Amino acid sequence: MECASCAIKQLIYQYAHYLDGGDLAAVAGLFSRGKIIAAGGDGDTTTEGAEAVAALYASFTRLYPDDGTPHTLHLTGNIVVTVEDDGAAAGAQSSAVVFQAVDGFPLQPIIGVRYEDRFRKAPQGWYFTERRIDTRLVGDLSKHLLRSV
């Protein structure tokens, strides 16, 4: 029997690993049937589908030429998964703190976020239908982002 909570946590962790590895196509692939909602003071911004998510991350994320990564480490935790009674849908809440270090920029936390996720189950397994990103804490993002958010 599959552990739904385990499979969902794996997706949450994959997002962080792909992003830290600079694999923006893999990040986008997680949302081939889903959307990302960025919560903001001026209202929410929704990006739907792998192609749009790939373009979004490419427009914001600074990848360094030495290794093709953003030189970040996402620490994701406090994951709470709730599977619906029918076993075909689920939700999860989690938090992440992102650390970064580059030349001239010592290791430091640069942002803290809260994720509110929705998932569906298909014959191939679980997938994201929605990720809501709520930025809670902001540090120096100048070495991480290509433009301000």
Where are these regions (language model features)?
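Short, low-complexity N-terminal intrinsically disordered segments enriched in polar/charged residues
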Residues: 1-21, 25-30
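Short glycine/serine/threonine-biased micro-segments
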Residues: 20, 47, 110
